[in-house]
Amino acid sequence: MILSDRDIRAELESGKIKVEPSEGLEDRIGPDGIDMRLGTTFLVFERNKQAYIDPRKPDSAKGTTRQIDIKPDEPFIVHPHELVLASTLERLTISNDLLGRLEGRSSLGRLGIIVHSTASIFHPGWDGTATMELGNLGVMPVALYPGMRICMFTFERMSSPVENPYGSKANKYQGQTGPLPSGVWEELDDELEQGELRKGKQAGLFAKDGDS
């Protein structure tokens, strides 16, 4: 069940939802969510000597992103067909019985700006700023400014508190304070250590019908 503005205010009061900094927060609470603002740090992608990025080889991603920090009154230009990692100005903390969902804003969508490619869910127990996968689907560059409303968070109540909230184990993005690049290599390292993708193991997982 998605929380209403009344429920969101109650959870902010109880501490189950925390948003910092909180100045002007009341004005950004909508009927079913909270508007979040754009931070000042961006990761832009650049071509390098690597032919492609290999999720099994962390070195293949070295030099593919460059960090840009801008002043609060400076614009950041998102060019057509460009992918940029950015983060919310606010740090969000949610309890073990709530799930957060990052949504785009219609006003920016009509300019071609999307705020995530796949990562919209923030699991129970999440704590940190939210990394956004900003993209420009339009034909014109678009200027974005730190502090502007960039996305909205909605919240859903779980059927019960989760047993293993995000952060109870080693989670690569927990506690982030700015945009972070992909951590897919950590996942593959864990899988390889467990033997899930090791050559000759679990061959039946990839077997085709009729293979013996």
Model-derived features with residue positions:
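DUTPase catalytic domain/fold
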Residues: M1-S212
